[in-house]
């Protein structure tokens, strides 16, 4: 796939995207492939569709909160959606994202990617719980392929109950996860259909509260 084809496919997801952001994402794809030869950053079966399955899939989050300047991505793994979001934030004055990743090798990759791409990403190589009191409430919290919705609420409760919006990417079992989480939590939900996978959704969650037994 040529750079122009990649740019056009990105514009279909984020119409206002600049060529500079597209070039950053293309550079990230190249860096990701190089590091993937040494460490497991993503399922090998998806590397042939890296641009679509991971980069475009992550890019679709940004238009849902494009005015937000402080983002937080938990369980950042290989940088989806955290580094992808950082590429968009690089053109937003004052924009920044915190990435939390406990695996040392993946955190090292994230730091390398942030430096190589010159994007405003701060990488924290620790457990999510260790950052509860250290990261001020962001405007947006993201997570992709990390945990059940119920567990995500437990991990992000401090931020989501203090005004942060969640954008959680979920697969085909999302409705079961929503139903199970409503047993112990109340929240406002807007469900966005994924532009990449018709069986997947983005759950936009606000006003999270733990139910009192």
Swiss-Prot record:
* InterPro entries given in the database record: rRNA_ssu_MeTfrase_G, SAM-dependent_MTases_sf
Keyword rRNA processing included in the entry's annotation? yes
- Please list the residues that bind S-adenosyl-L-methionine: 75, 80, 128-129, 144
- The primary location reported for this protein is cytoplasm
Taking the record's annotation, the residue ranges forming a coiled coil are none
Q: What class of enzyme is it?
A: transferase
Q: Where in the cell is it found?
A: Cytoplasm
Note the PANTHER family from the entry: S-ADENOSYL-L-METHIONINE-DEPENDENT METHYLTRANSFERASES SUPERFAMILY PROTEIN
The Swiss-Prot or TrEMBL record describes its family as follows: Belongs to the methyltransferase superfamily. RNA methyltransferase RsmG family.
The record's section on HAMAP family has: 16SrRNA_methyltr_G
Q: What is this protein called?
A: Ribosomal RNA small subunit methyltransferase G
Which species is this UniProt entry from?
A: Brucella anthropi (strain ATCC 49188 / DSM 6882 / CCUG 24695 / JCM 21032 / LMG 3331 / NBRC 15819 / NCTC 12168 / Alc 37)
Gene responsible for this protein: rsmG
């Amino acid at each position: 796939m040529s750079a122009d084809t990649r740019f056009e496919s990105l514009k279909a997801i984020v119409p206002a995207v600049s060529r500079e952001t597209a070039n950053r994402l293309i550079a990230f794809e190249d860096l990701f492939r190089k590091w993937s030869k040494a460490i497991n950053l993503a399922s090998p079966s998806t590397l042939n569709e890296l641009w679509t399955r991971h980069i475009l899939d992550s890019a679709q989050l940004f238009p849902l909160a494009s005015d937000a300047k402080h983002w937080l991505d938990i369980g950042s793994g290989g940088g989806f959606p955290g580094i992808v979001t950082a590429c968009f934030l690089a053109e937003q004055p004052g924009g920044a994202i915190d990435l939390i990743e406990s695996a040392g090798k993946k955190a090292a990759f994230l730091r390398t990617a942030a430096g190589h791409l010159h994007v405003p990403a701060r990488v924290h190589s620790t457990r999510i719980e260790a950052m509860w009191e250290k990261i001020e409430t962001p405007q947006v919290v993201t997570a992709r392929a990390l945990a059940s919705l119920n567990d995500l609420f437990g991990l992000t409760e401090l931020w989501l109950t203090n005004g942060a919006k969640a954008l959680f990417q979920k697969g085909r079992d999302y409705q079961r996860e929503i139903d199970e989480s409503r047993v112990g939590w109340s929240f406002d939900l807007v469900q966005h259909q994924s532009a990449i996978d018709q069986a997947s959704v983005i759950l936009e969650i606000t006003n999270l509260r733990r139910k009192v037994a």
